[in-house]
Regions:
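Mobile, glycine- and charge-enriched loop segments
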Residues: 20-31, 120, 131, 135-147, ...
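Active-site beta-alpha connecting loops in nucleotide-dependent enzymes
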Residues: 34-37, 303-306, 323-393, 420
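Acidic, Mg2+-coordinating active-site environments of NTP-dependent enzymes
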Residues: 60-65, 172-317, 342-343, 368-377, ...
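Phosphate-binding loop of NTP-binding sites
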Residues: 77-209, 213, 217-226, 260, ...
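ATP-dependent carboxylate/acyl-activation modules
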Residues: 97, 305-307, 422, 426-428
């Protein structure tokens, strides 16, 4: 069956699912394979649970004569081709977003701002890979007049694959930093991979990028593209400055031809979120959202999922940034915490994963920076930090840290919690 015919079937379905445990009535189930599972084996269950059709790529799982089964050569490729075909049919303007740090927060901020005057489809959570991007595109409906599609990468070529599926009309790279070094091989590999967004947009005649003018790496690879620039310099499309950060980020912004600044009080923690917020201002303004609506949207946005969240417990004030960590974001968080006005500071930091051959060196740099900042009350969690030279308390895993917190609970402290999601630092919150 060709993709046009599959698309016609898709249009009769209520939604698309790849999880046989979650099959809404009338949905299309697509059987994917992984290292430890074969979705084909669950196609029958999906149909019993509510799916109207099931796409499988092993004929043995499709009973002869049952028209609810659609047999294809490769289910994953079919998912991606179907998403691309649907995207072309909808013709919705798409803003593609990638970057090492801040892309999910920026996506949320952009979508919040744009939703003031537009019907916006945007990536849910961080479904930003070769499966998540197609699933996002397949949620496009005629009533959507804009889409914000987040794209993640952990290996060279990942962004190239995703932009060819999504075919964005606009692009933004939040920044480039040291993450997934194990997959990319080097910092240069990261720049090249993130730059695949720009490479694709150069092939589109009317394409536009939104660029943080203060970032030299982005400026270097943005040649030959129509640019809408934002940053700290005068004369840019949007110009802005941080005005406060204790603990919430406050900033001002104005357009290139305005003389008066707009002041925004956010619920975001950290100066490192300023470029993310300014990107949302820029894109909102570009798409016709009024300044007052932009300011209101940003002021009302509350971060979720352990991303720079402020939480007050009965005993302490917590800054929870335990969703992910890499050398760039870790340095930014520590630097911001250093400059924050607060007494009795404590840091709980977890290992940074997927750094490959650079891992030992990058963890040592963080330990050295903590010493340089003069922090005394620090708990380092994980085997990678344990192997560094430092004068701090070290724990092999979060279980050991929790045992210590149960013996002696900190009180009256402002505590930064930062580490890779796999370290599970979010589980310490209830003990603080």
């Amino acid at each position: 069956m060709n993709i046009t015919a599959i698309h016609q079937i898709f249009l009769t379905c209520t939604s698309v699912t790849t999880d046989s445990r979650n099959c809404p009535q009338g949905s299309l189930f697509i059987a994917l394979k992984g290292e430890s599972f074969n979705g084909n084996a669950f196609a029958a269950r999906a149909l019993e649970s509510g799916s109207a059709y099931a796409i499988v790529d092993e004929e043995a799982y499709a009973p002869a004569g049952d028209t609810r089964y659609i047999v294809v050569e490769n289910s994953l490729k079919t998912l991606q081709q179907l998403a691309n075909y649907h995207r072309r049919q909808m013709r919705t303007p798409i803003i593609g977003i990638t970057g090492t740090n801040g892309k999910t927060t920026t996506k949320e901020l952009m979508s919040t701002v744009l939703s003031q005057t537009h019907n916006v489809l945007y990536t849910l959570g961080n479904l930003n890979n070769h499966i998540g991007v197609p699933l996002t595109l397949l949620r496009l409906r005629p009533e959507h007049d804009l889409a914000v599609v987040e794209m993640g990468a952990s290996h060279p070529g990942d962004i190239k694959e995703l932009v060819e599926i999504a075919e964005p009309d606009y692009g933004i790279i939040t920044n480039v930093g040291k993450a997934h070094l194990e997959g990319f091989g080097s910092f240069e590999g990261i720049i090249k991979t993130k730059g695949e967004m720009y490479d694709y947009l150069r092939t589109r005649k009317e394409a536009t990028i939104f660029i943080h003018n203060d970032n030299p790496y982005l400026k270097k690879i943005a040649y030959g593209l129509h640019q809408i620039a934002y940053g700290s310099e005068d004369g840019l499309y949007i110009n802005g400055h941080v005005t406060g950060n204790s603990p919430y980020l406050t900033f001002e912004w104005k357009t290139g031809n305005e003389s008066k600044y707009h002041e925004v009080q956010t619920q975001l923690i950290g100066e490192y979120n300023f470029p993310n917020a300014l990107a949302a201002v820029t894109i909102g303004h570009f798409f016709g959202v009024e300044p007052e609506q932009i300011d209101k949207a940003l002021a009302g946005y509350t971060p979720q999922n352990n991303r720079s969240q402020l939480k007050k417990t009965a005993d302490n004030t917590l800054i929870i940034d335990a969703y992910n960590a890499n050398p760039t974001s870790m340095m930014a968080s520590i630097s911001n915490f250093r400059n924050m006005q607060a007494e009795n500071k404590m840091l709980i930091l977890g290992d940074m994963r997927e750094l490959g051959k650079d891992s030992a060196d990058e963890h040592q740099k963080i330990a050295d920076y903590l010493e340089e900042c003069g922090f005394k009350d620090v708990a380092l969690v994980g085997k990678l930090f344990a192997a560094t030279r430092h004068s701090y308390q070290s724990y092999p895993d979060v279980t050991a840290l929790i045992a210590e917190l149960q013996r002696e609970k900190p009180c009256g402290k402002t505590i930064l919690i930062k580490g890779s999601n796999g370290i599970k630092l979010s589980s310490v919150v209830e003990y603080l």
